[in-house]
Design a protein with these regions (language model features):
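RNA pseudouridine synthases
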Residues: 1-146
Length: 146
């Protein structure tokens, strides 16, 4: 679950791109086309609510790469609120944000059958909504997540 400082181009989408990490600067670069050294990434998003120029979105990772959510959403011109690395500095300052508004509110387990975590297969763990949701989206409730 995250807050974006712009609305993505579609209400829901599955994004396919390529990701390269610069270990020296601890930043990543996203490309729409395959390149040497880049790894495929797949990020799914769904807009849950929009208000006052901000967008509450649910993100599902189909791959898990460094800064994937942050960089991929910035790549489509919908950066995370509070993100000092890939985000909109001016908007972050105007909102008085010092950290990114991103929270893993739900985890689903799909381990390999022979894994020591196999007993968790199909289990879902859901956390309460983070405080930033009520701060920026006071009319949103957990029932809207379905």
């Amino acid at each position: 679950l995250c807050v974006l400082t712009a609305t993505p181009p579609k209400q829901t989408d599955i994004l396919h791109a390529y990701h390269w990490k610069d270990a020296k600067t601890n930043t990543v670069t996203i490309s729409d086309h395959p390149k040497a050294g880049y790894r495929e990434i797949i990020t799914e998003y769904r807009v849950l609510q929009q208000q006052n120029g901000l967008c509450l979105a649910e993100i599902t990772l189909h791959t898990g790469r460094t800064h994937q959510i942050r960089a991929h959403m910035a790549h489509i011109h919908a950066p995370l609120a509070g993100d000092s690395k890939y985000g909109d500095r001016r908007k972050n300052e105007s909102l008085h944000l010092k950290h990114q508004l991103l929270c893993a509110y739900q985890l689903q387990f799909h381990p390999e059958a022979d894994s020591c975590l196999a007993y968790l297969n199909g289990k879902t763990v859901t956390a309460p909504l983070p405080d930033f949701v009520s701060r920026f989206f006071p009319t949103f409730s957990s029932k809207n997540r379905k």
